[in-house]
Amino acid sequence: DPPGGWPKAFTADVERVCEATCQLMGTSPPAGDRYQLVIQMLDSGYGGLEHDHSSVLQFSWSGLAKKDGYRQLLQLVGHEYLHQWNVRRLRPIEYRPYDYGRSVVSEGLWFAEGITSYFDLALPLIAGCSDRSMLLQDLGEELSRVLMTPGRRIQSLSDSAQEAWIKLYKSSVVSPDSQVSYYRLGAATAFCLDVRLRAVGSSLADLLRGLWQSHGRSGRGFHRRDLSAWLKPLEPRLATDLEHWLDQPDVLPLHDCLAMIGARLNPVPLQRPHHGLTLTDSNGRVVVRRAASDSPARTSGLVPGDELIAVDSRRLHSGVLPLPPLPPRPPFQPA
C-alpha cells in the first residue's frame, strides 16, 4: 500500500470511471460483470495491457505522489477499461483475427490507441472525479507534447502506426527528431475530429458508438473507408481532411480547432538557457548523443558522435561539464 494508505474513495472512484466508460459507449460492458483490474504499483513504470475480461495496469509510487498522479491513475483505469470495446472487440481489419505469432502491420493502431487516449482524459470528468479546468490542463499538456516533438514534421500518423514494430518499440535518443507517437498524435487527431463533428451537431463519441454497433458488436474489422463512410453524410470535407491528416506530416489544424472552442495554447518561456544537447560519457570523453532539432546545438552544426573538446578554453571531461543541464521543455498553457 502507498504511504498513508490508498485514498478512501479509490474503489468507488474506479467504479465511477468504469460506469462513465459505459455511459460514453452507451452500452453495458461487453465483458459482462466479470471484469478484473490488476493494478501493479512499482518503483517506476507506467502502462497497461488489455484482455477480453481483464487488464493489468502498472503505475509508480512516485507517480501517485505527484499533484495530478491520482487523476492520471484513474485515466489509466479508464483507458484500459475502454479497450474492452475499442481494441478487444472493435478492431482494425488487419487484426481480425489476432495473430500473436508475427508482427501485424496496421495503420488502424492510431484509432485503437489514439481515440482511447483522447477519451481517457475526459473519463474522470464524466465520472465526477475531476473538473473542466483539470481536463483543459490535461488536454493542453497532451497537445503540447505533440507540438514539442520535432518528428511530427517528418512522420505521418499513418506511418507512425504502420512502423510501430520497427521504430516506436525500438526507439533511441534521436527518435523524437524523426518520429511521433501514434498514441499522442492519434489523440490530437481525435481532438480535431471531435471539435469538427461537434460543429455539425455530432461528436467523436457518436462515431465510436456507431462503429461499435456496425462492426465491434458483430466482430467485423473496420477499415479507413468505414470512417470516411460515417463522416461523409455529416461533413464531407471532414472525411477528406481526415485522409490528409493521416497521410501527411504536420498538417493537423490544432490551433484552428482550439479557436473553434474558444481556447488557445500560449508558449511558456524557458527560465534557463536551452542548448538542446544530450551528452554521454565515452571513456572519459564528452560525446554528443543528441542535438535536438531546431536547437542552438543543431544550428551550430553539432551532430551525434561529435566530441566536445572544450568550452570557453576549458577542457571538458565527463566529470566536469560546464554546460547548463537541459531543462524539460515546458508545455504550452491553455488559455
Model-derived regions, located:
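Acidic/His/Gly-enriched intrinsically disordered linker/tail segments
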Residues: L90-Y98, S103-Y183, Q213-S218
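Acidic/polar loop patches that form or flank catalytic/metal-binding clefts of enzymes
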Residues: P30-D33, I93-E94, I126-Q137, L204, ...
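Beta/coil-rich, acidic/histidine-enriched accessory regions frequently appended to metallopeptidases
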Residues: G216-A335
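Generic, well-ordered alpha-helical scaffold segments in large soluble proteins
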Residues: D13-L24, S60, L76, E80-Q84, ...
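Soluble non-cytosolic domains of exported or imported proteins
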Residues: G4-R16, K67-Q72, L76, S106, ...
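Acidic/histidine-enriched alpha-helical segments
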Residues: D33-Q40, L136-G140, L208-R209
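Juxtacatalytic substrate-recognition/specificity segment
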Residues: D1-L109
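Amphipathic alpha-helical substructures
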Residues: W165-L258
